[in-house]
């Protein structure tokens, strides 16, 4: 009954439509919005789920000429005699009330975020189950969005497993290091990850203006001593920083920092970007961390008097990351794949000893959040429909 129409009428000089639903809730719809979203074949291409009506053809002051309704539909005639029919459930879903809009945004963007520190229970699923079953793939990606990290176990100890996950999502994110890349000790390394030294907490690739959203790392070979992985929930650390030192939070969320990456791999590259280390949305919520100390440029485009306060704020942020309450340490085994949110988590690695042979080998890849979210929405629909 919630999507059943009790009454529909035009208001405000016919520039507004009001619907009273059988659950006694009311919805208001501007006439211009209704005309813009007419679902007829002249205005909407159903096969592409795309609007055909041109913006320049829309009368922004349009009113409703005629309106009738039944329990399941509203029928509107416009001043130029164009005719539109709207389904009740379609209208109810797109109600413009604050509560209805918030509900729909939650359905579209999966905003739930579970913060964690050293107490993290690392979410773990079976690699083959994720590839084979939609329910497991949905659990994988929904947990990845909520917690920020999922470990998959049971993959092989051969290269190529991250490519399989890329196909499961849609496709991988190509960077200057290739579709996939090998993390191992290399002579004349073109990235600090390709050494045996300690890697401090960082996000990957802030040197790009659009850093990859999701990272996949598959353990092919693991060293006996050292090489442990460390992760920290950057969003949780940001909350702590904002509470403990609001000025430091303000500096890191307002100062543009230069990042650079120059070298040769998939092709030759010379990359430059500018980011705030803590990136906020229009509501002041943290949406991305952009920080890699290795690729933070020596060029710093700020007035001299702001340099030292920036370093003080950054040190405070890094110290919070490295606190025992914040970081989680684990060791990957051959056949493990960790998948994590590169916009939220910062990751690092403990050093390990170099030998005459390669003692530690990971294969990595990236995915874009748009690709991941697309697959997540499709999987949810399949699981809910029992397909």
UniProtKB/Swiss-Prot annotation:
GO terms for molecular function: gamma-butyrobetaine dioxygenase activity; iron ion binding; zinc ion binding. Its EC number is 1.14.11.1. Zn(2+) binds at residues 38, 40, 43, 82. It is found in: Cytoplasm. Keywords: Carnitine biosynthesis, Cytoplasm, Dioxygenase, Iron, Metal-binding, Oxidoreductase, Phosphoprotein, Zinc. Pathway: Amine and polyamine biosynthesis; carnitine biosynthesis. Fe cation binds at residues 202, 204, 347. Binds 1 Fe(2+) ion per subunit. InterPro entries: AlphaKG_dependent_hydroxylases (IPR050411), GBBH-like (IPR012775), GBBH-like_N (IPR010376), GBBH-like_N_sf (IPR038492), TauD-like_sf (IPR042098), TauD/TfdA-like (IPR003819). Signal peptide: none annotated. GO terms for biological process: carnitine biosynthetic process. One of its GO terms (cellular component) is mitochondrion. It catalyses: 4-(trimethylamino)butanoate + 2-oxoglutarate + O2 = carnitine + succinate + CO2. It holds the Pfam family TauD. Gene3D superfamilies: 3.30.2020.30, Clavaminate synthase-like. The modification Phosphoserine is found at residue 351. Its cofactor is Fe(2+); L-ascorbate. The keyword Heme does not apply. Belongs to the gamma-BBH/TMLD family. Catalyzes the formation of L-carnitine from gamma-butyrobetaine. This is Gamma-butyrobetaine dioxygenase. It comes from Pongo abelii (Sumatran orangutan). The gene is BBOX1.
